[in-house]
Structures are given as structure tokens and as C-alpha cells.
From Swiss-Prot:
GO biological process: nucleotide metabolic process
Class in the EC hierarchy, top level: hydrolase
EC number(s) on file: 3.6.1.9
Main location: cytoplasm
Native organism taxonomy: Bacteria, Bacillati, Actinomycetota, Actinomycetes, Micrococcales
GO molecular function annotations of the record: nucleoside triphosphate diphosphatase activity
Residues annotated as catalytic: 80 (proton acceptor)
Source organism of this protein record: Leifsonia xyli subsp. xyli (strain CTCB07)
Protein name (Swiss-Prot/TrEMBL): Nucleoside triphosphate pyrophosphatase
Pfam families: Maf
UniProt catalytic activity: a ribonucleoside 5'-triphosphate + H2O = a ribonucleoside 5'-phosphate + diphosphate + H(+); a 2'-deoxyribonucleoside 5'-triphosphate + H2O = a 2'-deoxyribonucleoside 5'-phosphate + diphosphate + H(+)
Role according to the record: Nucleoside triphosphate pyrophosphatase. May have a dual role in cell division arrest and in preventing the incorporation of modified nucleotides into cellular nucleic acids.
Family membership: Belongs to the Maf family.
Length: 215
């Protein structure tokens, strides 16, 4: 069973590989700010869960048709993440000054990482069904110093990740505690994805296709 990953996120790819799955990576072209603005114009402000679920769905739907002229035959997964603290929603900071401001505000405190999941059953080259769910993990930060923040930002790592932090790389020592599925903080909740796969009446182990992994 093939799993198509509608994302270029190295973290999501690494998670799936570690779980025994070698996905087919299909970059998804979604104008996220425009999509959120359009949804809010129609429905009003989106909750964090609603926003990440919307973007996860749009990413999956954007690549469900064909890949290099070949029909997609398998499951298509789209994911999105955002970090919320004090009622403010934080995506990727992109710029060092924004990442620095966020870290100075969140150090020593706790926020919530929201992760949206959307899975399309596209076996046989046609859409048979689609399911989605969100996962939330509480993240407590260490009371990091200004020097640590500056060094972390200089590495470039926090600029292109939701909330300006990672748990599986340089940012790991700055995370004091995680409540919830730890993989949620990395990029997708593996337990949530397994639940969605089973909702489609597919066994999770049918997705195992990495070298050295067999039933």
C-alpha cells in the first residue's frame, strides 16, 4: 500500500520512515494565507484546530489527481501544524527577529501545538473516501537564556517550523515537557494517522514498506 505525502517537511518524512513507511513525496502548492483568509471571510475567525485541519485537507486535495502523468493509487496524506500561546496562533516565523520575539515570550511557559491530519483513500486512481482529525500536545519550555535564543536562531532551524521550535533536533534541550503524543510536536501524530488509516478499513502494517521491515 502506497502512502503519498503531500508535504516537503523533512520532519514528517523522517517520522514516517522511522515508523517503517517510505512515502511518495508530492509537494503541495497551497497558498496558505489566502486559503485561511477566504475561509475566515466566509465563516469568521478559525480556531487553531479548524485552521490546521483546513490546510491539511487542502494540501491533500491539491495532489490527489496525478503524479508525473501517472494516477495516484494509494493513500494521500496532508498535514499542517500551528502553535498557540496566550490565545495567539504562531506558524513559521520565517524571520530571525520574529523568532527571537516569540522565544523571549514563550520561554519558561507552556503552549499548545495543534496538528491537522487529512487522509484520502485514492486506491484505484479514484477518490473513495476521506477522513480527518486533529491532535494537540502541550509543550512546556525551559527558561532559556538570551544567548541560547540567539545561538538557536543563528542556526536557522527555528525559522521554518511552527512555533519556532523543534523537539527532535537542536531545539530538543529547550523543551522541558510534552503532554500528549510526542510525534505531534515533530510534525504529525502517528497514533492519529493510524486511527485514520483504520477508519478506512486498512491495517496500519499494510503501509510498512521500508527496507528491513516486513510482516
Amino acid at each position: 500500500m502506497r502512502l503519498y505525502l503531500a508535504s516537503t517537511s523533512p520532519a514528517r518524512l523522517a517520522l514516517l520512515r522511522a515508523a517503517g513507511i517510505e512515502p511518495v513525496v508530492v509537494p503541495s502548492q497551497v497558498d496558505e494565507p489566502a486559503a485561511v483568509a477566504a475561509a475566515e471571510a466566509e465563516h469568521g475567525p478559525l480556531s487553531p484546530d479548524a485552521m490546521v485541519q483546513l490546510l491539511a485537507r487542502l494540501k491533500a486535495e491539491a495532489v490527489r489527481g496525478a503524479l508525473d502523468g501517472e494516477p495516484i493509487d494509494g493513500l494521500v496524506f496532508g498535514g499542517d501544524s500551528a502553535f498557540a500561546i496566550d490565545g495567539a496562533l504562531h506558524g513559521k516565523p520565517h524571520r530571525p527577529e520574529i523568532a527571537r520575539e516569540r522565544w523571549r515570550a514563550q520561554r519558561g511557559r507552556t503552549g499548545r501545538l495543534h496538528s491537522g491530519h487529512w487522509l484520502i483513500d485514492h486506491r484505484g486512481g479514484v477518490e473513495n473516501a476521506a477522513v480527518g482529525a486533529t491532535a494537540v500536545a502541550a509543550v512546556s519550555f525551559a527558561d532559556v537564556t538570551d544567548a541560547e535564543i540567539d545561538a538557536y536562531i543563528a542556526s536557522g532551524e527555528p525559522l521554518e517550523v511552527a512555533g519556532a521550535f523543534t523537539i527532535d533536533s537542536l531545539g530538543g534541550p529547550f523543551i522541558r515537557r510534552v503532554e500528549g503524543d510526542p510525534s505531534t510536536v515533530v510534525g504529525l501524530s502517528l497514533s492519529t494517522l493510524r486511527d485514520l488509516v483504520r477508519q478506512l478499513r486498512i491495517e496500519w502494517t499494510e503501509l510498512w514498506n521500508r527496507a528491513g521491515v516486513s510482516l
